[in-house]
Amino acid sequence: MFSAETYKQRRAELARRIGNGLILISGNTLSPFNYPNNTYSFRQDSTFLYYFGLNIPSLMAVLDAESGEAILFGDDFTVEDIIWTGPQPRLVELGAQVGVSNCQPLKALDGVVATAMKQNRRIHFLPPYRGESKIELSRLLGLPLSALYPHKSVDLMFAVAEMREVKSAEEIEALERAFQLGYAMHTTAMKMCKAGVVEREIAGAMEGIAKSQGLGVSFPSIVSQHGETLHNLNSDGVLENGRLLLVDGGAESLENYCSDHTRTYQIGRASCRERVFSRV
């Protein structure tokens, strides 16, 4: 997480670019793996992280593009929650970490959105990609699920993209850390690239590096001798001399910045022809 001032400056610039209406930014929720209390590893929405910095599930935020005021919505952990999670900071404490003083319960978001809609103010939102987010936006805005994409804010899409494509010095440092993790993953894969090794052994070693020094892989690693198949996630092949191994993998740094490297490695001794191509 960066300083509170960083997030305040980002929100102020976003409000300036949009200029009118309310900007609704949805955080992600926990998603069940195979039953409600067993969830996938949590990954916060990247736009929420960029403007509000909190890597915690079930948060929502509104930014008034006219006044510049930001409101953070969420619920404090209950006693039942704390049994499982241990003591957690209150919402107002989380808000202070990212420069937001107006923190309200999640249910208060309904009233804020309803009031804005009665005033015919535009509600800007990005096209959602998770089912849970689609359902919540549909409920909040009174739109059928099929109408969410047509009602997306193109202005907001361009504003967010234009801001995020220019990286600050502290972001570049975070990207460098993600790059170094990716480098360690790929050099490990290169050293393991020997006949008889199972592809998943290499994939597992790479994931272990990403998890031990960062937040894990930035996407499911592709480790396959069948590089002709795009996004081949099957890693059950046994490495054979003379074959080529495609390795597409990257890591997510502790600051949620990601690397993505793709390399092809020779299994066994390279032929003269292969050595020529490797120098190109």
Predicted regions and their residues:
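Active-site neighborhoods and metal-handling regions in enzymes and metal-associated proteins
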Residues: 1-278
